[in-house]
């Protein structure tokens, strides 16, 4: 049953924790994000940021604690069920198929997002194909929003596309299901400084294009978080140690100690 609080975050975790062989990789994390918010997660290497996203997206099963999406408990759902409920994500390492075209990579995401059965594919091909290609048109329009030249290159193989455009394709593919929450794990990994600024600006514009969406960004560089997220959450040793805007975070003694005492990602 959905929770009926007077205030309901779009995504909320309560005491979320996971234990691997006696080590609490994520420990007692309370977190909230509202519609149309962008929140950054940051912390030293191994601090639990990606593990936290893996629990929220159903890849890992929490040892204790709960996660709610729009008031519905999603803690025990499998990844595809979480995806169907409205959480989509990208990964630090590319999930594109290098020997498929840009358009075909979008089609892979579309087919997954529509939850078609084998029977649908064989016995209702016209309906399935019509819906798929309608979604492809939407995907190409999203690509045009990020980079118009990508639409002209939709038949190029992914391996021949610049790295920043591969990131755009992955984000576009994640948006095709029209998620409530978008999780981005180091979307600027492998980009130079100029490309990083461009990418972060494009992420900021996502909430203008997709009304109501909430975005969670993991980044390894504190400076990258200066302009875009409204709020930053800092992890260290599996725990949330600080939360606030950029200026509050960079002056927080717990954060300073965490970065001086550990290797930054």
Give the positions of each predicted feature:
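Short, Lys/Arg-enriched N-terminal segments with co-localized hydrophobic residues
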Residues: 1-7
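Glycine-rich phosphate-binding loops of nucleotide-dependent enzymes
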Residues: 7-265
């Amino acid at each position: 049953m959905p929770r009926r609080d007077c205030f309901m975050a779009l995504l909320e975790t309560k005491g979320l924790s996971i234990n691997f062989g006696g080590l609490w990789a994520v420990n007692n994390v309370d977190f909230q994000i509202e519609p149309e918010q962008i929140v950054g997660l940051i912390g030293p290497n191994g601090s639990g940021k990606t593990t936290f996203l893996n629990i929220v997206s159903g890849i890992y099963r929490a040892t204790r604690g709960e996660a709610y999406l729009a008031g519905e408990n999603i803690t025990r759902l499998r990844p595809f069920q979480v995806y169907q409920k409205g959480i989509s994500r990208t990964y630090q390492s590319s999930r594109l198929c290098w020997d498929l075209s840009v358009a075909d990579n979008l089609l892979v995401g579309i087919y997954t997002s529509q939850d078609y059965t084998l029977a649908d594919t064989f016995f209702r091909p016209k309906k399935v194909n019509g819906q798929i290609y309608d979604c492809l048109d939407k995907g190409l329009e999203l690509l045009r929003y990020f980079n118009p030249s990508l639409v002209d290159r939709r038949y190029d193989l992914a391996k021949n596309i610049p790295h920043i455009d591969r990131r755009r394709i992955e984000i576009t593919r994640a948006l095709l299901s029209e998620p409530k929450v978008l999780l981005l794990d180091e979307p600027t990994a492998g980009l130079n400084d100029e490309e990083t600024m461009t990418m972060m600006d494009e992420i900021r514009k996502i909430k203008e294009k997709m009304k109501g969406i909430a975005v969670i960004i993991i980044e390894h560089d504190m400076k990258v978080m200066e302009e875009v997220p409204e709020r930053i959450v800092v992890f260290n040793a599996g725990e949330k140690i600080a939360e606030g805007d950029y200026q509050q975070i960079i002056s927080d003694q717990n954060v300073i100690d965490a970065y001086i005492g550990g290797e930054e990602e």
